[in-house]
Amino acid sequence: CSSDLNPKIESVREGVKLCKENSIDMVLAIGGGSVIDCAKVVAAGACYDGDPWDLVITPRWIKKALPIYSVLTLSATGSEMDKFAVISDMSKNEKWGTASDHMKPKMSILDPEYTYSVSKKQTAAGTADIISHICENYFTNVKNADVQARFAEGLLKNCFKYGPVALEEPDNYDARANLMWTASMAINGMIQYGAEVAWCVHPMEHELSAFYDITHGEGLAILTPHWMEFALNDDTAYKFADYARNVWDVVNDDDMAAAKEGIACTREYFKKMGLPQT
């Protein structure tokens, strides 16, 4: 299954047509999240009589799907280990997420060496996507879910440590391996148990890329620090302070001041990774 920068419904329709005309009995996705997302909806669309766009905007209509297998070549979306897919219809400037247990890959091959050739741009954008997935699950109003919080903080520290290494040493196995496994852990459900997850930043980025077809991770890197500043207030300062102290090793007893330092560290990190700021 081949796909675009942001997987398009036209690619899905083409894939569904091929499956139906050739009695295909499984779908193999070789690539990153865009390819895997496309493959998931192709697999579901092959078992549906209508337009596959119906399954994007109405996930409950997904009743079955062809078996899906993936070979991951880009660490970012975590699509290799979850039930989600995001598809765009540029003719309508719409980008929607869909989900179904039927679309979970039956098997995914994760070999870090397959990511050695990923460009600096995509490595940086992919790392930003991983970070955003973790933050979406981490910044919630649920208190005392310490196992999930510490797990999320560990995953974030992994991104902040190994992202720059992968940029400078693209064939560094440890960096690529840690980013690859972190991407899968970030969105497979492990860190959201017991949390009330709102998913604030991703929907905003979907609107941006629906109109401008920008790289998803770059859009997230632009939006994330701004969202953090918007969400920071007296009621949320404690959580952003935890983030600053436990992830960025900020030493400041004042929650609000510590929180602002953590946000500044995040913005500076994205800048050093070569990601756009506006």
Residue ranges of each PLM-predicted region?
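Glycine/serine-rich anion-binding loops at beta->alpha junctions
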Residues: I24-K40, T73-S79, F211-I214
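Structural motif
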Residues: L5-E14
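Short glycine-rich or small-residue beta-strand-to-loop segments that form or flank ligand, phosphate
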Residues: V27-I30, Y69, A186-I187
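Short Gly/Thr/Asp-enriched flexible loops that form oxyanion-binding sites at enzyme active sites
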Residues: R13-V16, V35-D49, M81-D82
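Active-site segments that bind and position negatively charged phosphate/pyrophosphate groups
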Residues: N137, N141-C265
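A glycine/threonine-rich phosphate-anchoring loop and its flanking beta-alpha core
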Residues: C47-R150, Y238, D242
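Short, small-residue-biased leader/transition segments that mark boundaries at the very start
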Residues: C1-S2
